[in-house]
Amino acid sequence: MALSRREQRRSGASTFTKVREACAHDCVLLFFAEDRADWIHIGPIANRLEELGNHVLRLTSDPADTVIGDQGGLFTGGIVATTRLLVSLPPCIFVTTMTDLGTYHLKRSINDVKYVYVFHSLLSTHRAYRDHAFDSYDIFLCSGPHHVAELKKAREVFGLNSRELLETGYCRLDYLIKQEEQFVQSDRTSPSVLLAPTWGPSSLIEYDLELIVQELLGASIEVVLRFHPMSTRHQPELGAQLMTKYGSDPNFSLDQSFSSIDSLMGADVIISEWSGVAHEFAYGCLRPVVFVDTPKKAHNDTYSQLSLGCYEDDVRESLGALVAPRDIGSIPEVVTALVKESPDWKSKLSELRGRHVFNPGRMVPVAVEQIIDRMN
């Protein structure tokens, strides 16, 4: 249950007191989530550090975050309270997957705080994010070689302060790899597809999403549609509209649980354009992706200054198939062909995962060791 406004104000003040008292007596690790979904990427690291006897405080600016009741998480209050808390944090190590620190209302502390950034996507850093999204962090737990190269080049080109670029891995993959090892695929006669559009101008929502659904259902292919959380936030009517139109077809369903991996585990193929979840599926489940070649997902105009390609451009065809928007009608055939070749894709994607991601399946213990080293 979400907190009332009065409870939010009281909780924000109480959190500041608890953080200050904790940091005065101990080397404290603060884990901060803007949204409850952030714990997918930082929660396992916090849990393991705590199991090893380290003092961990979980902070969240989401009043409905279950970590408040389940794991003693502290609510930081509304925008004003959270802003005041972060700018006055006592010396500590602050771990987050929130981008844009220092760009908007949330700033670095005036005190000696070490900021550790954990990636929530495998996408490149220099195009899919806003300008200066990564300027204010001290330590990066990089997911793959491309993150190291991009952040190093950005430091050189833009004259940024020195920061540590660690070869860590991608937390979400640890969980997916473990689940895939235990997963038993159900028997079925036709393929199952997870349709996972990203959000924004490049999304399939803007490029014949319904035609893709129609073509797949017409070929008796099971379709599970899962929107990006930002799409449901800005276009909450989308799901209901499509359920009204296609809900009577037994092969169509809508997945509205953003934290669940059931739709990922159950899919033979994922269809997307620029969504990071497609890469999680490919490397975590070792199954192929169909990318629809919509315009590139760019959130700044300066990415070309690095003179570096983007990881998500380089691997698109290697992870499955690339389909032009004008060829959407061919998607059922492409899906069927990929499913027939699934044993080959398993070995190929495993090799690609080892090339593009640090420490697959071992990110959490590596991250924990790196953080503990920096506490000392």
Tell what function each PLM region has.
Residues 85-87, 133, 186, 215, ...:
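Structural alpha-helical scaffold elements that stabilize or flank donor/cofactor-binding regions
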Residues 30-177:
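Active-site and donor-binding regions of nucleotide-sugar-utilizing enzymes
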Residues 1-27, 33-35:
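Membrane-proximal basic amphipathic "stem/tether" segments
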Residues 82-86, 237-279:
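Donor nucleotide-activated moiety binding/catalytic core segment of transferases
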Residues 2-13, 133-205, 229-232, 346:
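A nucleotide-sugar donor-handling region in carbohydrate enzymes
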Residues 134, 162, 276-355:
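Catalytic binding pocket for nucleotide-activated donors in carbohydrate/polymer assembly enzymes
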Residues 73-81, 252-256, 319-330:
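Short acidic-hydrophobic, aromatic-tinged amphipathic segments that line or gate anion-handling sites
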Residues 38-54, 171-243, 324-328, 339-343, ...:
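Conserved catalytic-core segment of nucleotide-activated headgroup transferases in glycan assembly
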